[in-house]
């Protein structure tokens, strides 16, 4: 699997990736954790609280655990995010290999 930088794909990049055996996986809108936004305006706790309110079943999450635009890396929020989602009844699984080999994710 692969994720296009910025989530931007074209028909050509998707064809090229498929020819190389890759399936593009895009994150869900609620799955953008905001961790590339400036820390002074979007502190980790605010991003964590927003994620815990917004994420729904089946969402694919995307996080940069350390990025130049943040003075406070988001990585320390990963454990509270997973714990909070589990406390809300979420489960975590590996992506099924069979659906990836067919070039799509099964729902």
PLM regions and their residue ranges:
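Short, well-ordered beta-to-alpha junction loops that form the rim of enzyme active sites
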Residues: 4-7, 63-66, 97
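His/Asp/Glu-enriched short active-site or ligand-binding loop at hydrolase and phosphoryl-transfer sites
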Residues: 8, 12-52, 89-101
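C-terminal domain-boundary segment and adjacent tail
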Residues: 69-107
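Amphipathic, non-transmembrane alpha-helical secondary structure
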Residues: 44-53, 75-83
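Sec/Tat-exported extracytoplasmic proteins
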Residues: 6, 55, 65, 86-89
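Conserved, mostly hydrophobic/aromatic
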Residues: 2, 24, 61, 85
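Active-site glycine- and acidic-residue-rich loops that bind
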Residues: 6-7, 34-41, 68-78
């Amino acid at each position: 699997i692969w994720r296009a930088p910025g989530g931007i794909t074209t028909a050509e990049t998707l064809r090229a990736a498929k020819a190389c055996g890759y399936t593009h996986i895009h994150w869900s809108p609620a799955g953008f954790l905001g961790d590339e936004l400036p820390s002074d305006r979007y502190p980790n706790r605010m991003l964590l609280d927003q994620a815990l309110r917004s994420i729904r079943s089946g969402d694919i999450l995307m996080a940069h655990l350390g990025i130049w635009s943040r003075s406070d890396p988001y990585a320390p929020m990963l454990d509270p995010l997973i714990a909070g989602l589990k406390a809300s009844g979420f489960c975590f699984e590996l992506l099924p290999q069979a659906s990836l080999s067919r070039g799509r994710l099964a729902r």
